[in-house]
Amino acid sequence: TGPVDLIVSGHTHSEVRAEVNGIPIVQARSSGTALGVVTLTWDRGHGEVVDHAIHVWTTRHEGVSPDAEVAALVGRWTDEVEAVAERPIARLARPLRRDRDDESALGDMIADAQREATGDQIALVNGGGIRTGLDAGPVSYADVFAVQPFQNALVSLDLTADQLRRALEAVVQDRLGQVSGVCFRFDPTRPAGERVIEAWLEETGEPIVGEGEVVNAGLTFSVTANNFMAAGGSGYDVLAEADGTATGLVDSEVLMRHLSSLPQPVEYEERGRIERLAPWPE
């Protein structure tokens, strides 16, 4: 057999019972609605898996009495977690909404928090990493966790000017990402990979892209992204080419600290970093 004997998959919330190139693959839907069971038959003489059986069993809870010991344990931990989750960390003067089509104050704040935490020149945030908005009033740990639930680690990357241009092209894919430390103008009606018309550093105004081309190919930039993006996720393939350093920081924790450090109640406006030159195509 090859180096892989079994793939246990997730994330898509699908039921998978499959075999590809002799490798069994299982996924048991989501949220405890099913159990995946795979039986592998091991040949001791040859030191390899020689057979397998895949099952996905639907779970049932109707009419089943909870186990008293387990229920007590769940109740205790629920109470302890809720005490922390509902603890207020900040107060918003107005709602902060996510926006998948344009720059948003929430996206700016998240990107600013990450850039401030790492000290890099630029921060890039994938749009899919911002799951919901924040209402006006008290903001709790649970509220921030709902915005960034994946607990992604932050990575510091060194990008060439052309790699940064390509990363900005990934920002303006079908669903817009958010940025800090860089400003740009883009045309969503242009072909993918050719949408960023102009880009420059936010603090100094130093040009990065002009008329769709890199201005100074010899420049390099320090860029913060989460580990999912740094591995090429969400179309950010170019980031996987770059040298990266783990920062030891987690996105949601960084946002919590940033929010609590701001003058209260928090007022956050869009920074005007992203200019869309035409409507998104239908």
Task: Explain the meaning of each model-derived region.
Residues 5-13, 25-28:
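Active-site neighborhood of phospho(di)ester-bond hydrolases with catalytic His/Asp-centered motifs
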Residues 1, 16-21:
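Metal-dependent catalytic neighborhoods of phosphoester/phosphodiester hydrolases
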Residues 1-9, 101-102:
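Active-site-proximal segments of metal-dependent phosphoesterases and phosphodiesterases across multiple
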Residues 9-10, 21, 33, 177:
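Short solvent-exposed loop/turn micro-motifs enriched in small/polar/acidic residues
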Residues 14-15, 32:
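Glycine-rich nucleotide phosphate-binding loop and flanking beta-alpha elements
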Residues 4, 15, 164:
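Long, structured stretches of catalytic cores involved in phosphate-ester chemistry, encompassing
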Residues 29-282:
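Catalytic centers of hydrolytic enzymes
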Residues 21-22, 45:
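Beta-strand-connecting loop/turn residues
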